[in-house]
A protein has these predicted regions:
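Short, solvent-exposed loop/turn segments in extracellular or other extracytoplasmic domains
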Residues: 212-216, 329-331
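Beta-strand-rich extracellular modules
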Residues: 233-237, 350
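Edge beta-strands of extracellular beta-sandwich domains
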Residues: 238-252
Length: 401
């Protein structure tokens, strides 16, 4: 520090730290730099989102005389994954949005936080990573092919003075959902804007005018089967601004207009296969006249900080890893009360347990899935009482990680 001051008295110096500030204090180095930075990931690698502002207050009490910066924060987002009950490490667009919607206002309201750096602007390659998109760190506000994620527009709504209006999840072109009547399915859709209110239209019909709080509003959209056009309209500075979202929606109902169903067992998330232009939807328990699983339980993905919503296994031979990373183990049957007819049934399997040990990734901060005791899993499959597979052993026939 003294050397830097002698060479350039105007240059600021900073020490970036992780959240365990006491380690740096005990080493006697927190008083050396002019600024202190902290990498904080409350609610992503562990804990909950509310722990972020608690940590900020704690750090301010520890270092009241130091300007503080958040030198890293972020959550991984795979733009193909969605969830209406988002949780940490599900890699959904919706959890990423919730994360930044929580962090950014907490940063802006505190004058002692003099700067913050999102980790990262762009997704980037990281060879040892697995999870939803192996070999990629997905914490960017922009994907590797420069697709802007929803969080990008949240920052614009907060930081730009010119009008901002953006319908979230615009890249989700192929949507689907369970429908009671086969004609419509209601799902929430967010709009980011720095206007006070926004009017939302579906296929030319107004759904109402909605007040905006903290630069975002969530609107329940009654999507119909087929093409949907959602328009958002604001007035700002005497001018009208519009944004539009177009998607194809498949209302899944086994009685009315049934054509297909693509289900992720063991999942609460949706996955868009953009190549096949199809959408996988979360599982549900079977009920008469409908569809769903019978028996079993969600495959555990245990870590030091609780269970994760999906395995972190790299599925070889595909880039559609999220299709294979959730399971319902011990399932007795899957039943769909579809009309009489001829159907094609595709069953996708993978073995997520393994005898092989693997090295934990240090930057996952304890969130690597703990290997369960290996089970030599063998099973058979019948469809409508007809045997289609006997004594399947996925690990033996195709291998495991």
């Amino acid at each position: 520090e003294a050397q830097i001051r002698s060479l350039d008295s105007e240059r600021y110096t900073m020490l970036p730290c992780h959240s365990a500030s006491q380690i740096y204090q005990e080493a006697g180095i927190t008083e050396l730099p002019m600024l202190l930075g902290f990498n904080l990931y409350n609610g992503w690698y562990g804990g909950n989102l509310g722990g972020f502002e608690e940590k900020l207050e704690e750090l301010h009490k520890e270092f009241p005389h130091k300007p503080l910066l958040i030198t890293e924060y972020g959550a991984d987002v795979d733009t193909r994954i969605h969830s209406f009950s988002p949780v940490r490490f599900d890699f959904s667009c919706e959890f990423g949005s919730v994360y930044h919607e929580h962090y950014l206002p907490e940063i802006l309201k505190r004058n002692y936080i003099v700067g913050a750096m999102v980790w990262n602007l762009n997704d980037f390659y990281s060879e040892a990573r697995r999870n939803a998109m192996p070999h990629v760190n997905n914490k960017g506000l922009v994907s590797t092919d420069r697709e802007r994620k929803d969080g990008y527009y949240l920052y614009q709504a907060y930081l730009k003075e010119s009008p901002v209006l953006h319908i979230a999840s615009k890249s989700w072109k192929n949507r689907a959902g369970a429908s009671r009547d086969g004609k419509s399915c209601t799902q929430p859709l967010k709009v980011y804007t720095n206007a006070d209110k926004v009017e939302v239209f579906l296929n030319g019909k107004s759904l109402g005018v909605y007040p905006v709080a903290d630069k975002v509003v969530s609107v329940d959209i009654p999507f119909v089967n087929g093409k949907n056009v959602v328009d958002a309209v604001i007035e700002k500075e005497g001018r009208e601004y519009r944004d539009q979202y177009v998607c194809d929606f498949k209302c899944v109902n086994v009685k009315n207009g049934f054509t297909e169903i693509n289900v992720l067992l063991g999942a609460r998330r949706y996955f868009e296969d953009r190549i096949a232009e199809m959408c996988w939807i979360p599982e549900q328990a079977y009920a008469e006249g409908s569809w769903g699983y019978i028996g079993g339980e969600v495959a555990p993905n245990k870590t030091r900080y609780g269970s994760l919503p999906a395995s972190d296994t790299d599925i070889l031979g595909t880039d559609q890893d999220p299709v294979f990373q959730t399971q319902r183990v011990g399932i007795e049957a899957f039943k769909a009360d579809v009309p009489d007819g001829v159907y094609a049934v595709y069953l996708y399997w993978t073995e997520l347990t393994s005898e092989n040990k693997r090295e934990a990734l240090v930057y996952n901060l304890g969130n690597d899935v703990v290997r369960e005791d290996y089970i030599n899993r063998v099973f058979s499959v019948d469809i409508n009482g007809v045997s289609v597979a006997k004594q399947l052993n996925i690990a033996e026939e195709y291998g495991s990680e």
